Design a protein with these regions (language model features):
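Transmembrane alpha-helical segments and their cytosolic interface motifs
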Residues: 15-23, 191-222
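Residue-level signal for the membrane-embedded core of alpha-helical transmembrane segments
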Residues: 24, 53-56, 181, 209, ...
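N-terminal alpha-helical signal peptides/signal-anchor transmembrane segments
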Residues: 62, 82-89
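N-terminal juxtamembrane/topogenic regions of multi-pass membrane proteins
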Residues: 1-80, 95-99
Length: 222
């Protein structure tokens, strides 16, 4: 879910001017018809219909906001876990022997986050995967259906290599593994939001009834 910080008014106007023009023409037709052939429409049904529509639209807006808030929380969890992983790599691994591994883990996490961003937006992640990783290092992950998850698995293997080399102990490895689990859980939540959009009924019925209300409104006001 990509939301601009500042509304794009030109884009909004470009999307709504045609329906507004059609409604304006319809309002003129209803008004002219009323003066030529006077009629009286009851206002109570329209009032009840408008109240029900407001509740329906409010419920849909609440559902959409909850999804946005959950996505925001998941991305915040990803940021915090990435910082924790970077801090653990710099704190646990020795500065001399493990400097290259420190850098590799941090660069892999940077690559992972950007590849995940591309996957969620249905963009090709190859360019981001090769930005900080060598072709040989990125190749195993690029061959997988879920490239981001492949990169994360590779990070776990790097941590295990550090334990086998004696640079970290099993307790430190378990601590880093918990951070990787938090990262994987955040990714799973984001993919769930992406792959499970709001049902079509949430989109179709509010739009249909809103259009119907706009058509009936001038009839009830004249």
């Amino acid at each position: 879910m990509i939301i601009d910080a500042v509304p794009r008014y030109r884009q909004i106007v470009a999307e709504v001017w045609r329906p507004l023009l059609v409604l304006f023409v319809w309002d003129v037709i209803v008004t002219v018809t009323y003066y030529v052939l006077p009629f009286k429409a009851p206002s109570l049904p329209l009032t009840l219909f408008g109240s029900a529509l407001a509740l329906f639209l409010g419920f849909r807006s609440t559902s959409a906001y909850e999804r946005w808030w959950e996505g925001r929380g998941l991305w915040g969890l990803m940021i915090n876990a990435s910082r924790s992983l970077s801090r653990a790599a710099r704190s646990f691994l020795p500065d001399e022997e493990g400097r290259d591994l420190q850098r590799a883990i941090i660069l892999r996490q940077i690559t992972y986050v950007n590849v995940l961003r591309c996957q969620l937006r249905k963009q090709d992640p190859r360019e981001e995967a090769l930005r900080y990783l060598s072709p040989d290092e990125a190749a195993p992950s690029l061959e997988r259906l879920n490239v981001a998850n492949g990169i994360l698995d590779g990070t776990g293997r790097r941590v295990d290599q550090a334990r086998q080399a004696g640079w970290i102990d099993t307790i430190q490895q378990a601590s880093i593994e918990r951070v990787l689990i938090d990262i994987a859980n955040a990714q799973g939540g984001m993919e769930r939001l992406k792959n499970t959009p709001l049902p079509n009924q949430y989109r179709f019925f509010p739009e249909f009834f809103a259009r119907l209300f706009c058509i009936l409104l001038p009839i009830g006001l004249v």
